[in-house]
């Protein structure tokens, strides 16, 4: 079976790696991001890809930066058939990509050339797209610009979040990769150059983009909430403090209340947004609290507001 160096970090990559292992590919090395300390207690957190690799006793490399590292020198000596990446999170040196005997292949979470970059899944939700998908592509020096070997589309439902799409696309990407790799060996793989006129970029989500503001319609705010679930979460400022919203739904009825105002807190919590639109909050997280459904919030803090109160700070 073909030999592989695999590079990936989150669960998206872990699902792909597990598929390669189960199909009998010879995994020569696994490269993932360094362990992180998370939370108030600074607990050391390993990536999902590292956990999968250790479970199967595979050699793991975790350079802070692959370029110019000692780890890179070791990896260059392996010369595998394939170098495969799935949500690794670093640029790869061209000389390393060229060390693959057959091809350097990436599993990308969008229908390229739409959404090159680090947050393709988030942008598909943020922009209200009706479909997304995965692309199996050649890795080249320029980010996500290589030829396309295979693509498969996936509908986006109104209930989907980035989290649910990550899960769906990891399985779709795994299956499409495993379907495509044998075509390299038997010579039936096809390649299609990307149309540079149709390129759309999806840079990593910035801190400024996390905030729900008064210029957004209910639909736009809901798209942001879905796009940033499960991480980092969308928020607005309420009484000078962050108030995260994990789940909401836009209502069809219009209101005359100005944007950012409480429309009702009787059995449900509805706020007005731009253009007279209304957003019903379903799952929230006030600063210093755990996530809660809106019923629990209305039984406590949420009951103290009066219809017409300003909820979203400027």
Curated annotation (Swiss-Prot):
Which Pfam family, giving just one, matches this sequence? Formyl_trans_N
Q: Which chemical reaction does it catalyze? A: L-methionyl-tRNA(fMet) + (6R)-10-formyltetrahydrofolate = N-formyl-L-methionyl-tRNA(fMet) + (6S)-5,6,7,8-tetrahydrofolate + H(+)
- Chain sites annotated for binding (6S)-5,6,7,8-tetrahydrofolate: 110-113
Which superkingdom is the protein from? Answer: Bacteria
| Enzyme Commission number, as recorded | 2.1.2.9
May I have one GO cellular component term? Answer: cytosol
Key words, A-Z: Protein biosynthesis, Transferase
Q: Does the keyword Protein biosynthesis apply?
A: yes
Question: GO: which molecular function terms?
Answer: methionyl-tRNA formyltransferase activity
Physiological role: Attaches a formyl group to the free amino group of methionyl-tRNA(fMet). The formyl group appears to play a dual role in the initiator identity of N-formylmethionyl-tRNA by promoting its recognition by IF2 and preventing the misappropriation of this tRNA by the elongation apparatus.
Q: Which family does it belong to?
A: Belongs to the Fmt family.
The record, for NCBIfam families, names: fmt
Give the protein's recorded name: Methionyl-tRNA formyltransferase
Gene designation per UniProt:
fmt
């Amino acid at each position: 079976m073909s030999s592989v160096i695999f590079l990936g970090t989150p669960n998206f990559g872990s699902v792909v790696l597990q598929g390669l292992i189960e199909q009998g590919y010879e995994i020569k090395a696994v490269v993932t991001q360094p362990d992180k300390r998370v939370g108030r207690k600074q607990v050391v957190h390993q990536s999902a890809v590292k956990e999968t690799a250790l479970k199967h006793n595979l050699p793991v490399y975790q350079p802070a930066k692959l370029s110019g590292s000692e780890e890179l020198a070791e990896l260059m000596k392996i010369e595998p058939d394939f170098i495969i990446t799935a949500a690794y999170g670093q640029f790869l040196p061209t000389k390393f990509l060229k060390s693959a005997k057959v091809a350097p292949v990436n599993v990308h979470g969008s229908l390229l050339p739409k959404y090159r970059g680090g947050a393709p899944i988030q942008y598909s939700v943020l922009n209200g797209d009706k479909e997304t998908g995965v692309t199996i592509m050649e890795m080249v020096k320029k980010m996500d610009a290589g030829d396309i070997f295979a693509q498969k589309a996936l509908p986006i439902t109104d209930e989907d979040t980035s989290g649910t799409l990550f899960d769906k696309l990891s399985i779709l990407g795994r299956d499409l990769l495993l379907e495509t790799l044998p075509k390299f060996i038997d010579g039936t793989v096809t390649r299609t150059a990307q149309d540079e006129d149709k390129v759309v970029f999806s840079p990593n989500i910035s801190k400024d983009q996390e905030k729900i503001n008064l210029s957004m319609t209910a639909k736009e705010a809901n798209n942001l909430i879905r796009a940033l679930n499960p991480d980092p979460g969308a928020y607005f400022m309420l009484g000078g403090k962050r108030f995260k919203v994990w789940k909401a739904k836009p209502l069809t009825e219009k209101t005359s209340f100005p944007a950012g105002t409480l429309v009702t807190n009787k059995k449900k919590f509805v706020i007005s947004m731009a253009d007279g639109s209304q957003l019903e909050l379903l799952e929230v997280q006030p600063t210093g609290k755990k996530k809660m459904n809106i019923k629990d919030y209305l039984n406590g803090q949420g009951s103290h507001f009066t219809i017409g109160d300003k909820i979203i700070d400027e």
